[in-house]
């Protein structure tokens, strides 16, 4: 089988390494891929949002199955375009991807169908939003409606911070059109849990839960990032809570999308907060999370391609999705200065042992050398019989990934160990 994976980050590298385990897979193309993915797939310089070119390439190569991993092409209808060309693929169509593509849509969906989430108000007028903030409870959360590279959510500790965030989005257009509408919602407290789930629009098969570490600095300080590391499973996500989430959140979400004629097939990501009042949805994503994928897929014992195809074919109920009962930890190695400004173009060296456990994100091949080209450069994952061992081993392996100005948080997983 010839496969195509759209995307070029650490998440895509993890997906490709997992898909390669299927003996029927003969070739994998990554569009655009990256310098590290090139070791495991044929990288083609077509951007993830160049949908016409992606479809033309898939037809030319007679691709048997495609996986669209990032949010942008999903929201833009990449799956729709591939399916129209008779290429089966994994991922939601554009009508369903709106669950991530519009925060206003997802909040209104939850309100309409009684799915637990934070109280909120929606604004398309800046003056009205600023007036509301004069009396809103503080801290509060300001969210841009559209996609913003995971950076469109501001937790404001003061009224001035909240108003500045609204002005940035609605007046200064820091997220372009994504900030034309904003959601202002109540600040929830409690442990956060990420749950990725396969769904064919009928049944939901959750993957192992995980815990992300979003802040740049140790002790959860500094700016929000795309994620500096993950552990799985999440110790706060007990079997009782998992059952409650299935009944109150997962199945009702899939049913709600069906009712809206927006059937969701693919990977649905639930960002949850375990509040004193029970689990609530902070956000939905219409795809595998990054870096959650880098801990979840190494624990998957079932064949990924088989599960993906069952999701596409509507036969997920008859397909086993089994995970190991071990623990995984992923440590991100980033360029110093991320997520603000950082230098690029440094040579990356990896010990063979580190390379075998590392997913490459921000790197390019130039003259046979692997060079840094992004903020988050690599993610190194270890699997072990205990969480403490997985963390220790992930750091040991990650120390084998080296480049100038490399930066790692030193406390990935510590919060989970204290749970």
Language model: regions and residue ranges:
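Solvent-exposed alpha-helices and their adjacent loops that cap or buttress functional pockets
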Residues: 21, 36-37, 90, 112-114, ...
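Peripheral (often C-terminal) accessory segments that flank ATP-dependent C-N-forming ligase machineries
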Residues: 310-419
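A conserved helix-loop-beta module that forms one wall/lid of the active-site cleft
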Residues: 90-152
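Active-site "cap" helix and flanking loop/linker of ATP-utilizing ligase/carboxylase catalytic domains
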Residues: 246-268, 285-353
């Amino acid at each position: 089988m010839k496969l195509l994976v759209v995307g070029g980050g650490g998440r895509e590298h993890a997906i490709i390494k997992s898909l390669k385990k299927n003996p029927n897979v003969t070739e994998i193309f990554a569009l655009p891929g990256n310098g590290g993915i090139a070791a495991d797939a044929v990288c083609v310089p077509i951007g993830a949002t160049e949908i016409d070119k992606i479809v033309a390439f898939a037809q030319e190569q007679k691709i048997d199955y495609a996986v669209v991993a990032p949010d942008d092409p999903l929201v833009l209808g990449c799956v729709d375009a591939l399916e129209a060309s008779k290429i089966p693929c994994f991922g939601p169509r554009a009508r369903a991807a709106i669950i991530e593509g519009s925060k206003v849509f997802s909040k209104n969906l939850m309100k309409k169908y009684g799915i637990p989430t934070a109280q909120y108000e929606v604004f398309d007028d800046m003056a009205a939003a600023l007036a509301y903030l004069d009396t809103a409870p503080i801290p509060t959360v300001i969210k841009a409606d559209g996609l913003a590279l995971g950076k469109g959510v501001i937790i404001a500790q003061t009224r001035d911070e909240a108003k500045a965030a609204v002005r940035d989005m609605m007046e200064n257009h820091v997220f372009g059109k994504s900030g034309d509408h904003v959601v202002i919602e109540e600040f929830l407290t409690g442990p956060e849990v990420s749950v990725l789930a396969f769904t064919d629009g009928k049944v939901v098969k959750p993957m192992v839960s995980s815990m992300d570490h979003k802040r740049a600095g140790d002790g959860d300080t500094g700016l929000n990032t795309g994620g500096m590391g993950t552990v799985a499973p999440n110790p706060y996500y007990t079997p009782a809570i998992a059952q409650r989430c299935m009944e109150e959140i997962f199945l009702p979400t899939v049913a709600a999308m069906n009712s809206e004629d927006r059937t969701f097939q693919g990977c649905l990501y639930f960002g949850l907060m375990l509040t004193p009042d029970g689990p609530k949805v902070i956000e939905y994503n219409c795809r595998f999370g990054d870096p959650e994928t880098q801990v979840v897929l190494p624990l998957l014992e079932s064949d990924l391609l088989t599960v993906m195809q069952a999701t596409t074919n509507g036969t997920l109920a008859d397909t086993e999705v089994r995970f190991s009962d071990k623990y995984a930890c992923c440590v991100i190695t980033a360029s110093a200065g991320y997520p603000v400004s950082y230098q690029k173009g440094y040579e990356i060296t990896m010990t063979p042992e580190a390379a075998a456990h590392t997913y490459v994100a921000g790197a390019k091949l130039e003259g046979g050398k692997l060079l840094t080209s992004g903020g988050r450069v690599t993610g190194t994952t270890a699997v072990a019989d205990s969480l403490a061992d997985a963390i220790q081993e992930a750091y040991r392996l990650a120390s084998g990934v080296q480049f100038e100005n490399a930066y790692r948080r030193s406390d990935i997983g510590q919060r989970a160990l204290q749970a």
